Amino acid sequence: MGTWAARTQAAALHATLPRMDDNRPGAQGPQADPAAPDPAPDLALEAFTALCQRLAGFDDRLHPEWVDGYLTATAASWRTITLDELLEPMTGDAYSRTFADPADDAQARAVLEARMAALRQALDPESLLDDLDALRLQPWMAVWDDAARRELVEAGHVTEQEAATFHTGQEWAAGFLQATVDFAADWPDPPEARSGDPEGGLYADLLGTVAALAWDPASEEFRAFALAGWKNADPTRDEVIDEACFAVQELRLWWIDHPPKRPPRRVEAAPGRNDPCWCGSGRKFKKCHGVAA
């Protein structure tokens, strides 16, 4: 079994729905919000998990963790990215092959829309501003610990060396970063970053905090990241994940203060009243399409 397929299979065995433990400091589960639109968040996440596992039958990259990271990036953008916009870049032809039946397609879309709505609610700017210290984002992540890795190795799915590369949140971050590539126009380098403005540095740091989840904890780049954030101690995996989730929340707020500039709309100059009408009638504009003007 390939590494991607092994990740997909193992994710179903070692996932938490959601990963965030509601009694940890700062964590806020779906049931803590009385305005939550979904009365059964666990069932909604189970449906999302089952949907992604079907997608993974055609593209083993599309396991729930990766897809959830991808959807999270679209929810954290400065504008609303619709399901119709993101399906093809996210899934290629896997979605159309998996859900070819119209009824199946409608049900799958409802499941994805529900997950997207939950992510948008978690990243609602007003709610974030109400309590900047609250960890609202609840990512779908497979928990990789020594027992989970050992189980994969003993089942013969991967080697010990391959299992050692599996880390909680890694594929979620990979999905998030892929969405920023696929929707590069919605994740542009801000002018502040190009000009050396400190605000641009903050944007880069926030994205870097998410990217750090995808790095090998033994790598030099991760060690440099950990040293910058945790001066005298090695961070736990939970601490790194929490920082990434807070970074996503801050990115959502960053876009509120720094929306990309839209290109100016070009308005064609109207012909003069005595000019020939643009419709080709041969009459003057004032006696043709310019009458109303």
Enumerate the language-model features and the residues they cover.
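Acidic/negatively charged segments and metal-coordination signatures
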Residues: 2-293
